[in-house]
Amino acid sequence: MQLNKFFLGRWLTWPLAFSVGIHGSVIAALLYVSVEQMRIQPEIEDAPIAVTMVNIDTFAAPQPAAAEPQAEPEPEPEPEPEPIDEAPPEPEVLPEPVPVPIPEPVKPKPKPVKKEVKKPEVKKPDVKKTVAPPDDKPFKSDEPALVSTNAPVKSAPKASVPGVSTSTGPKALSKAKPTYPARALALGVEGQVKVQYDIDENGRVTNVRILEATPRNTFEREVKQVMRKWRFEAVAAKDYVTTVVFKIGGTTEMD
C-alpha cells in the first residue's frame, strides 16, 4: 500500500510541474513582446482626415435568388403482378341424348268420291216450219235490192307503221352479235331480249328500250353494250324492234 501511494504521488507531481512551467514561459513572452512594441511605436503626426460618402446599398448582401421549384419525383411504376397460371377449366360433361320416339305419319283419310249424277236430256219438240203458199202476183218494192254479204269486200290498205322491223328502212352496215354472259353459259341458261330503239341522222342507235327480257337481269347488259357499236345508213328512223335469242352452247341469233 505504501508503494502504491508513493508511485501515485510521484506520477501526479511531474505533469503539474510541467504545466506550470509552460504557462509561466508563455506569460513572460507576452509581457516581453508588449513592452518592446510600446518602445518602438513612432509618434503619430496630426493629418487631415478624409471623409468619403459610401452608399450602404452597394455593400448590402445580395438577395438570395428565388428558389427554383423542385421537380416532383416521378412516381415509380408499380410492378405488374405476375400472371397466375389458371387451372384449365374442366370439360363439361354433356348429358347423353335421350332418344325421341319418331311419331308415325298420319295417313290422310280418303276423300269421298262424288258420284256424278247425269241429268236426263230433255228433248225439244220438233217444230215444223210452215211455208206460205206463193202468190200469183209478183211483189214489187221500190227499195233497191240488197247486196249479198258473202261477196268479198276490198279493204283499204293499212298505213305501214314506221320502224316496226329492220326489213324496211335504213339498212344495217355493222350489226355485231352480243357476247353470251359467262354466268348464264356456266349455268346453262338460255333466253331472249326484245329491244326497241331509234336511229339518228348519222346512223347511230339511240333511245334503247327493253320491251321484253326472259329471264330478266341476265342478258340485257350485253345487248345494250353491243348496240352502241351498231351502224346503219344515215337515215333517221324511229321505233325499230330487234329480238336477240341466246341459245345453249354460246350462240346468239337476231331477227
UniProtKB/Swiss-Prot annotation:
Q: Which residues lie on this side of the membrane: Cytoplasmic?
A: 1-10
Q: Where is the composition biased (Basic and acidic residues)?
A: 113-143
Where is each TonB C-terminal domain found? 165-255
Q: Where in the cell is it found?
A: Cell inner membrane
- The stretches annotated as sequence repeats are 72-73, 74-75, 76-77, 78-79, 80-81, 82-83, 94-95, 96-97, 98-99, 100-101, 102-103, 104-105, 107-108, 109-110, 111-112
Q: List the GO cellular component terms.
A: outer membrane-bounded periplasmic space; plasma membrane protein complex
User: Which portions of the sequence form the region 3 X 2 AA tandem repeats of K-P?
Assistant: 107-112
Q: Name one GO molecular function term.
A: energy transducer activity
Renumbered to this chain, region (6 X 2 AA tandem repeats of E-P) spans 72-83
Periplasmic side, ranges: 34-255
Q: Which UniProt keywords apply?
A: Cell inner membrane, Cell membrane, Membrane, Protein transport, Repeat, Signal-anchor, Transmembrane, Transmembrane helix, Transport
Q: What is the documented function of this protein? A: Interacts with outer membrane receptor proteins that carry out high-affinity binding and energy dependent uptake into the periplasmic space of specific substrates. It could act to transduce energy from the cytoplasmic membrane to specific energy-requiring processes in the outer membrane, resulting in the release into the periplasm of ligands bound by these outer membrane proteins.
Listed under subunit, the entry gives:
Homodimer. Forms a complex with the accessory proteins ExbB and ExbD.
Q: Which PANTHER family match?
A: PROTEIN TONB, PROTEIN TONB-RELATED
| Name of the protein in its database record | Protein TonB
Q: Which organism is it from?
A: Yersinia enterocolitica
